[in-house]
Amino acid sequence: MPSNMKQFCKISVWLQQHDPDLLEIINNLCMLGNLSAAKYKHGVTFIYPKQAKIRDEIKKHAYSNDPSQAIKTLESLILPFYIPTPAEFTGEIGSYTGVKLEVEKTEANKVILKNGEAVLVPAADFKPFPDRRLAVWIMESGSMPLEGPPYKRKKEGGGNDPPVPKHISPYTPRTRIAIEVEKAFDDCMRQNWCSVNNPYLAKSVSLLSFLSLNHPTEFIKVLPLIDFDPLVTFYLLLEPYKTHGDDFLIPETILFGPTGWNGTDLYQSAMLEFKKFFTQITRQTFMDIADSATKEVDVPICYSDPETVHSYTNHVRTEILHHNAVNKVTTPNLVVQAYNELEQTNTIRHYGPIFPESTINALRFWKKLWQDEQRFVIHGLHRTLMDQPTYETSEFAEIVRNLRFSRPGNNYINELNITSPAMYGDKHTTGDIAPNDRFAMLVAFINSTDFLYTAIPEEKVGGNETQTSSLTDLVPTRLHSFLNHNLSKLKILNRAQQTVRNILSNDCLNQLKHYVKHTGKNEILKLLQE
């Protein structure tokens, strides 16, 4: 069996494999905690001194009558930031000593500092667990500065504090768009609660408009999955923090490249256009889309009769929550069975096909259950954020951290935290019974529109509002209550309308905007003159 780790949950584990003597010194100086990402808001980076001379000096001072010099040198090797690549070695960055690091030059795989003239390269064999913001660099020559100008560490939770660290690896076109939107959202929330423009709304509408105009089959595939909360829609469609697998809902070739979306803004009145997408659910045509097996056109019921889909979903709710044994073992298994039926047969209680073939094919292997639990969790976190009397960046940071590190979409079944039977255990084999609050969240999930989710047209929502059920209420809440709860978010977002008067249709203007973005102003002028 191999004796060395290939991925690391801690920097100390990597040190144990490479330099146990240095690890022992760090431990003896009570500095192991300084290498933990949990200690810092923005992760941690360790600079390992390759030069034996520096390590010998650390050892000599550590075991002397005054180990302060060894402590200071070790502190200079610890950066309270997650810096995985040279591209992130920018801005106000310093070591644990508080000394600012001045970068002289960055190359593809190397950073050269001015002060100390240290030459740093990323440790090729250090790969952290996906949810750990840890990095290790090798100092090949020079030294880290012990004195110099201080760097200005941003205040935790302060007004200028970014919602999440900007350093993330890998830095893909998807993550670039997400980080830009997150920064814009944090800025506008602190200014006016995004009452003028909501960045998540703008980008979600733009992406859907692009698909509708340029890739109608992709548009039909994703339309049943859009959410009344544009923040949820944005992350489910873009999947910006997924780093493993190629089962993206929307392929890379459609999103990026010479003819891709590339994050272009394509909207005139964001709120009105967003609501319009929900009215389109019952107005799609499938004359040119046939089932790959039968070659017959079979209109998915999520489009032809969404109300009946939700009626059947309510039957499933009732069966699960009125089951003879509502408990932490039986109930999650019944949830999984319902999702297995949907994934494998595209039916709910043998009624179907629920989704277009392309949609259900994209949701297999636990992805549909993962998506719906994601909706439920993010809805809850977002509601908490919006219910606060004053906006707190830290509340928004919690949402983004959850998406980045707990639910990136790398392993759907392992990222299930509420609905997976494995979280509750089997009392006959493990005796592991989950806390009551987790089970209460499962019941709330079943009692929400997020359970077996399909989008429903806004005009189909009606009825008198009733009191929302509590987390432990086993009686399914009526359908209109679920939907009115999410639709209430649209009342807030109505303030985010941006209307531009024009004599061209929205579709025409959106096509022109995308053309200008990727071909240049002169070309569009030539086109208009023809």
Curated annotation (Swiss-Prot):
GO biological process: viral capsid assembly
Induction or repression: Expressed in the late phase of the viral replicative cycle.
Effect annotated for changing residue 106 to K: In strain: Isolate Uganda
Keywords: Disulfide bond, Host cytoplasm, Late protein, Ubl conjugation, Virion
Outcome (variant: residue 87 to M): In strain: Isolate Uganda
Effect of residue 165 to S: In strain: Isolate Uganda
One of the record's GO cellular component terms: virion component
Site note Cleavage, residues: 158-159, 463-464
Site (DNA-binding): 10, 39
UniProt keyword annotation of 4Fe-4S present: no
Keyword Ubl conjugation listed: yes
Family: Belongs to the asfivirus polyprotein pp62 family.
Name recorded for this polypeptide: Polyprotein pp62
